[in-house]
């Protein structure tokens, strides 16, 4: 066995000790030697069986997912999710290593553990025919069809035609299934709690799910058609009848290194050797191959007392070897202190291993590593085997075919918790835990929108923000980074994926009008001379709320408006001004209620002028231009409603100071719309471009943060869009909003913004590189709760590209072509 070590100081450095000193696993003395011998006998009988049902490696499968592997042995399978490991910070990776170490150390010596990562291909008849977005309304049917075509084409570029799953199967001894249930339940609970420490969700598979997984390994490519209703005392059918192949040939065309199952060819390879360093990425390198794969690690814990005795025996043996070498040297006249380097090195390793077992919470395991792949032809199988072995060799892992042992190997790869292959070695806890099952993280949520392709694997990145506990989020990037393209794409995603929801856009630059028009939405322009009127004191949509609640909300809104009007607003409103404003808001509502109407800014302005304090006159003077003259479109009863499913509020005609005033007024309209009792069944998606402008005034920030915090409870999903975030993140309220959000789409950042995001989101050096100055437009980092995926995007030109594109040269060229076509007509 080659010398191998892990690259962490607190981990065993040279697992080669195990190979050099311990050799194979035949010397192990088990306390339950009789039981193990009986299990080995049954395994041999199963492997030799010529009857298919007797060959398949379990006796019974129960509805709850517990399998009787053989008499006295029962197993259960837990599926667990991926985590951002490969690009995570050093501290996060070390935490994951510690958790995986504690997970393996948890299992007792009488159990068996099987860790698997499976790349399962989607059915062939679904490739290229997947429906990502339903046609929906007539206005969007053509866009949905085009979108589906493009995404189906892109599926073939990565491994999106494969579905990756991770499983942990554990087997225990028990007299019968009733005795096994509490044992397995306790293990399941402890496993789920342990994995949760690294934000890894897990769940136990039920019987039907385990059978489907078994069939996928025994009969690759076949469709699962099992139902418990098909089993009955009269039918005589067994669960095995639905998962086992009709034919198995372990010498296809005279070969001994593969097999044929129902017309498909498969091969199982074994891990024979490790390099001088066990790389934590070696499993990920194999798993990320765009191939159907099953990577299986069988781990059999050894009792600590037995492991210590085993190592001590090997040390005693080496001491004897050293004495023999020294005596021989004396007889031949050599220096007896000069020992063969290999023997001296082995003795040092053995003593180091003994120290790890005694003092550093390490245990010893019998380890078997298997890699299983399959194909429709022998030629394709050979190519896939060559790919796997080449990648493994690049990671200094020796994979070899199991000649004449494919029969045993095929029974060892299904998730049953039973190993029929005798190619094994001893590894310690650290060496097993280093073999991380986490590859390039994928995000493929059914019903989600498209955000690009994984930069690591080429997979489609599909995210459904409605699944998040806090779906609020931010899309940020420098000008030219692809930020606007991403936002327009997400708006299209939302419209197509969630036809029952509403979309509202705050458009300070006037760039979303074409998209909204194409999606069948309404554009509302707020500017001098336009017909649209927004009343910030409107309460029409919250008429059923108590008067005190309505007044409190409107007071907050007017305080925010007043703060935005103040030149010294960055310091906030003085308490005296706050009291005057609150008093006048109440008086405006009371006076107008007598006439049975809602107050306007003019009524509020009149109430200010009637106050005795000189500060009231100053506040009234600030509002005067919004009550009289060209900017008076905020003084009147609202004639703008969110009746259309998609509404774009175009504010590019407003000046910078007035734009914040307009945003707050529009926010009030949205808040009136969503904060109703009981909450509306559908969601409202709010996209706020140039959101950083709302963080210049403390009172405005307080108002916006409250809406951000409370709106989620009423089905409001906010997205802040910004090209300059370092100033925004310097605000304490803004930081709280970021910390309470779970969705971030970050493109290329300036140095200051990059540092701010890295601190807020605890980005690793690798993750910083995904949004650094060297990335191309469209590239970035998508964060959805605990999932972090680097993205890239090369979206083909066409109708959708034209709707989303904001590159000035391409937009100008497109407009010239359109004008030329119109001139010809």
Where are these regions (language model features)?
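Conserved lysine of the Walker
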Residues: 483
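The conserved Walker
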Residues: 467, 479
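Extended, folded cores of ATP/NTP-driven motor/assembly subunits in large transport
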Residues: 2-438
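Hydrophobic positions on the alpha1 helix immediately C-terminal to the Walker A/P-loop
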Residues: 486
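P-loop NTPase motor domains
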Residues: 83, 90-109, 120, 287, ...
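Hydrophobic anchor at the beta1->P-loop junction of P-loop NTPases
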Residues: 475
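A short helix-turn-beta junction within AAA+ P-loop NTPase domains corresponding to the substrate/partner-engaging
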Residues: 521-524, 733-746
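Post-Walker A helix-loop "phosphate-sensing" segment adjacent to the P-loop in P-loop NTPases
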Residues: 493-504
């Amino acid at each position: 066995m080659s010398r191998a070590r892990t690259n962490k100081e607190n981990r065993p450095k040279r697992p080669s000790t195990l190979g050099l000193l311990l050799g194979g696993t035949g010397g192990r003395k088990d306390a339950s030697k009789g039981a193990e011998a009986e299990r080995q006998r049954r395994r041999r009988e199963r492997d030799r069986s010529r009857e298919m049902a007797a060959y398949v490696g379990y006796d019974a499968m129960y509805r709850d997912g517990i399998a009787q592997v053989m008499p006295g042995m029962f197993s259960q399978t837990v599926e667990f999710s991926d985590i951002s490991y490969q690009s995570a910070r050093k501290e996060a990776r070390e935490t994951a290593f510690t958790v995986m170490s504690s997970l393996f150390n948890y299992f007792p010596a009488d159990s068996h553990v099987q860790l698997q990562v499976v790349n399962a291909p989607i059915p062939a008849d679904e490739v290229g025919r997947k429906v990502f977005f339903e046609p929906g309304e007539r206005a969007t049917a053509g866009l949905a069809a085009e979108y589906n075509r493009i995404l189906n084409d892109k599926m073939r570029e990565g491994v999106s035609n494969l579905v990756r799953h991770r499983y942990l199967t554990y087997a225990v001894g028990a007299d019968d299934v009733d005795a096994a249930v509490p044992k397995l339940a306790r293990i399941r609970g402890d496993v789920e709690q342990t994995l949760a420490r690294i934000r890894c969700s897990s769940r136990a598979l039920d019987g039907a799910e385990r059978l489907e997984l078994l069939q996928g390994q025994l009969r690759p490519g076949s469709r699962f058609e099992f139902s418990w209703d098909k089993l009955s005392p009269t039918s005589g059918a067994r669960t095995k009848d639905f998962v086992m192949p009709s034919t198995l040939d372990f010498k296809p065309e005279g070969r001994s290194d593969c097999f044929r199952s129902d017309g498909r060819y498969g091969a199982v390879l074994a891990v024979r050797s490790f390099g001088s360093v066990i790389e934590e990425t070696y499993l990920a390198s194999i798993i990320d191959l765009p191939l159907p794969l099953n990577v299986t690690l069988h781990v059999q814990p050894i009792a600590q007392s037995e492991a210590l005795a085993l190592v001590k025996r090997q040390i005693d043996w080496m001491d004897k070897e050293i004495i023999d070498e020294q005596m021989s040297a004396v007889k031949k006249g050599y220096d007896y202190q000069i020992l063969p380097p290999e023997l001296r090195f082995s003795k040092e390793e053995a003593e180091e291993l003994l120290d790890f077992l005694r003092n550093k919470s390490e245990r010893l395991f019998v380890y078997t590593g298997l890699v299983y792949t399959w194909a429709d032809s022998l030629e394709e199988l050979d190519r896939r085997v060559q790919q796997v072995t080449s990648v493994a060799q690049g990671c200094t892992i020796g994979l070899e075919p199991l000649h004449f042992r494919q029969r045993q190997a095929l029974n060892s790869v299904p998730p049953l918790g039973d190993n029929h292959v005798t190619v094994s070695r001893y590894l310690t806890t650290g060496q097993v835990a280093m073999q991380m099952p986490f590859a390039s993280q994928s995000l493929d949520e059914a019903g989600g929108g498209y955000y690009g392709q994984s930069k690591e694997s080429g997979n489609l990145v599909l995210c459904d923000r409605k699944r998040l506990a806090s779906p609020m989020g931010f899309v940020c990037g420098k000008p030219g980074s692809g930020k606007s393209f991403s936002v327009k794409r997400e708006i299209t995603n939302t419209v197509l994926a969630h036809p029952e929801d509403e979309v509202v856009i705050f458009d300070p630059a006037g760039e979303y009008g074409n998209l909204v028009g194409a999606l069948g939405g309404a554009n509302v322009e707020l500017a001098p001379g336009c017909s649209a009127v927004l009343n910030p004191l409107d309460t029409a949509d919250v008429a059923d709320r108590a008067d005190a609640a309505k007044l409190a909300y409107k007071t907050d809104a007017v305080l925010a408006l007043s703060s935005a009007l103040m030149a010294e607003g960055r310091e906030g409103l003085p308490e005296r001004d706050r009291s005057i404003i609150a008093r006048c808001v109440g008086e405006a509502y009371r006076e107008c209620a007598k006439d049975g109407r809602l107050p306007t800014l003019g009524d509020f302005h009149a109430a200010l002028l009637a106050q005795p304090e000189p500060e009231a006159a100053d506040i009234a003077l600030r509002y005067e231009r919004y009550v009289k003259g060209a900017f008076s479109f905020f003084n009147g009863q609202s004639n703008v409603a969110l009746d259309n499913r998609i509404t774009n509020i175009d504010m590019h005609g407003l000046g910078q100071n007035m734009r914040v005033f307009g945003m707050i007024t529009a926010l009030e309209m949205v808040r009136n719309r969503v904060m109703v009792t009981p909450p509306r069944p559908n969601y409202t998606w709010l996209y706020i471009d140039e959101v950083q402008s709302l963080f210049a005034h403390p009172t405005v920030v307080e108002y916006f943060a409250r809406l951000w915090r409370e709106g989620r409870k009423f089905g409001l999903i906010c997205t802040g869009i910004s090209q300059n975030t370092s100033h925004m993140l310097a605000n304490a309220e803004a930081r709280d909003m970021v910390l309470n959000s779970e969705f971030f789409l970050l493109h290329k950042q300036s140095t200051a913004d990059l540092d701010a995001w890295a601190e807020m989101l605890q980005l690793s050096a690798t993750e910083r590189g995904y949004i650094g100055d060297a990335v191309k437009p469209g590239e970035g980092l998508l964060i959805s709760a605990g999932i972090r995926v680097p993205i890239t995007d090369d979206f083909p030109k066409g109708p959708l590209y034209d709707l989303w594109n904001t590159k000035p040269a391409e937009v100008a060229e497109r407009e010239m072509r359109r004008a030329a076509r119109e001139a010809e007509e």
